[in-house]
Swiss-Prot record:
Assembly and binders: Forms a complex composed of at least MKT1, PBP1, XAC1 and LSM12. Forms a complex composed of at least MKT1L, PBP1, XAC1 and LSM12.
Keyword Cytoplasm: yes
Lineage, uppermost ranks: Eukaryota, Discoba, Euglenozoa, Kinetoplastea, Metakinetoplastina
First-listed, main subcellular location of the protein, grouped into a coarse class: cytoplasm
Name of the featured protein: PBP1-interacting protein XAC1
Gene name for this UniProt entry: XAC1
Length: 117
C-alpha cells in the first residue's frame, strides 16, 4: 500500500523568487482594487509630482589654498614673462624705432574705414 501525501510537496524557492511572486500577486490585487473603488483624489493631483523647495544660496568661504595657488601662478607667470622680455630686448630689433604718435595715427587710420563701412 502506498501512502498518499496529505499535503502537496512544496518546491524550494529562493528569496528573490518569493519576493517576485509576492510582488506579482500584490500588483494583481492592487490593479483590481481601484477599479472597484472610486479614487479619492482628482486626476490632476494624482499626476503631480511634489517639487522640492529651491536650494538656499550658500556663502562659501574663500579657500586659502586657492589664494596661495593663484599667487604662485602669478609669480611664475611674471618670472616667465621677465625671462622672455629679457630675450627680446637682447635680440635684434624686429621693427625700426617709431614715435608713439605715428603708431597711434596709423591705428586710427586702420579703424576709420571699418567704422565707415
Amino acid at each position: 500500500m502506498s501512502k498518499a501525501p496529505s499535503q502537496p510537496a512544496k518546491k524550494w524557492m529562493s528569496a528573490r523568487t518569493l519576493a517576485k511572486s509576492e510582488d506579482a500577486t500584490n500588483r494583481k490585487s492592487n490593479t483590481a482594487a481601484p477599479a472597484s473603488q472610486p479614487s479619492q483624489q482628482p486626476a490632476s493631483v494624482m499626476h503631480e509630482r511634489p517639487t522640492p523647495p529651491p536650494p538656499a544660496p550658500v556663502q562659501l568661504p574663500q579657500s586659502v589654498f586657492f589664494e596661495r595657488q593663484e599667487a604662485v601662478d602669478t609669480l611664475s607667470n611674471l618670472y616667465r614673462n621677465a625671462q622672455s622680455v629679457k630675450k627680446i630686448e637682447t635680440g635684434p630689433a624686429a621693427f625700426e624705432a617709431r614715435d608713439i604718435s605715428k603708431v597711434h595715427e596709423e591705428l586710427m587710420d586702420c579703424l576709420r574705414p571699418a567704422a565707415a563701412a
